[in-house]
């Protein structure tokens, strides 16, 4: 059945223009000709479906925190049509058999596209034996031990060689264990003033530096997870200037908060931690000049009990799928820090290009798109989240703009209750 979407402001080739588009058989088709169904979008903006390359869906193994059903429902509500699932699961996806434990649930329960990562090391331990990259490659978007840094330089070099051979990226959580020293927030003024244990910036950037050298040596495509320090940004900038296949992401909380905003509350605890104002400024500069090409949420839900133990004892991780776009639109687009077009590139276009993912608004694409209501205003209320996780440092923030409709493969998977269309 052909559906014609009219009265829209459509993102195309880096700009918005008034227009219409059509979907048939799950794909975008030419708008001309007779349509079986017409949907008037009321002048709303339409963008390629958002893509989050860093999500913890927790299933299998930790369904008390999140399930694939609840996590992907949250993603759809946030405007995401594709999410990439991190491998810190039980069983960890380190063989085709253990990966299948996850993909079977994805096929049954997911409402958006879920593309899994395979582990780098067996058991996702960050050490020991490497996985069989060739065996996992057909079913994964890349290889990661997110949550752990691969400590051995030799092991990481061999991992990059094997990943390069199968044409997949290494997606690295960069953290030198020997530099952590029991820390859990940034080693800055707040940490020292309140008697906490700090995580130094070098624990991140030192491993980024090592890995970039290995990526250059092996020819591997290399992506840095959740950069948080100014040194990491500069290292990636220099690597890109040299033409290396290096990319990186950061998350909304690192762009909108710093350690000056910390409270004695587990909602403010994540890894890497909120860094200094100077680090945040460097991240914003990296967004502006294109060094940072991706914004990902690092959606990491935990139970209420796990997040209720203060900064020292709470589990690390916050949720982000349902409010990432609306926060960034309110606090980065509206003040003129980035354009809406730039934000769409960071949250939809660039992740697809870097990770070779499908879906979009061009004729022939899988019809994955998000309809945005840029006038919607509300407060972030974790009690209304579809995710099982409730811990966000943005609770109570006033926001503007949100997904009014999310469509995956031509199928509507989310519609905001305020969204009305003429059919």
Model-found features: residue ranges?
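C-terminal cap of metal-dependent C-N hydrolases
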Residues: 8, 310-313, 363-423
């Amino acid at each position: 059945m052909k559906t014609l979407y009219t009265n829209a402001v459509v993102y195309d080739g880096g700009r918005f223009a008034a227009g219409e588009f059509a979907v048939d058989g799950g794909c975008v088709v030419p708008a001309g000709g007779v349509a079986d169904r017409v949907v008037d979008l009321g002048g709303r903006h339409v963008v390629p479906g958002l893509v989050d390359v860093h999500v913890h869906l927790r299933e299998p193994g930790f369904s008390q925190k999140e399930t694939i059903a609840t996590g992907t429902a949250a993603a759809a509500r946030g405007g995401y049509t594709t999410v990439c699932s991190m491998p810190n699961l039980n069983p960890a996806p380190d063989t085709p058999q253990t990966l299948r434990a996850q993909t079977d649930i994805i096929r049954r329960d997911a409402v958006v596209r879920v593309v899994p990562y395979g582990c780098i090391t067996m058991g996702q331990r960050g050490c020991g034996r490497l996985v069989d990259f060739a065996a996992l490659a057909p079913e994964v978007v890349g290889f990661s031990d997110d949550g752990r840094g691969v400590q051995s330089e030799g092991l990481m070099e061999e991992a990059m060689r094997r990943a390069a051979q199968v044409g997949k990226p290494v997606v690295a959580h960069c953290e030198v264990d020997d530099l952590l020293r029991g820390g859990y927030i940034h080693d800055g003024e707040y940490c020292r003033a309140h008697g906490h244990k700090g995580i130094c910036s070098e624990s991140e950037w030192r491993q980024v530096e090592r890995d970039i050298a290995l990526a250059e040596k092996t020819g591997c495509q290399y992506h840095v997870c959740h950069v948080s320090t100014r040194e990491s940004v500069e290292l990636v900038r220099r690597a890109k200037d040299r033409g290396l296949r290096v990319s990186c992401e950061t998350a909304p909380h690192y762009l909108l908060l710093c350690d000056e905003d910390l409270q004695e509350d587990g909602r403010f605890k994540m890894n890497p931690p909120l860094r200094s104002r100077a680090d945040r400024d460097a991240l914003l500069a990296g967004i502006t000049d294109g060094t940072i090409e991706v914004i990902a949420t690092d959606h990491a839900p935990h139970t209420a009990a796990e997040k209720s133990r203060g900064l020292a004892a709470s589990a690390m991780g916050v949720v982000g799928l349902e409010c990432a776009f609306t926060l960034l639109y309110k606090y980065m687009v509206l003040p003129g820090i980035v354009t809406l077009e730039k934000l769409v590139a960071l949250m939809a276009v660039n992740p697809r290009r870097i990770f070779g993912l499908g879906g979009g608004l061009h004729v022939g694409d899988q019809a994955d798109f998000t309809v945005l209501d840029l006038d919607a205003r509300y407060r972030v209320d974790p009690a209304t989240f579809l995710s099982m996780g409730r811990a966000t440092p943005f609770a109570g923030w006033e926001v503007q703009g949100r997904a009014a409709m999310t469509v995956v493969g031509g199928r509507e998977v989310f519609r905001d209750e305020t969204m009305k269309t003429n059919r």
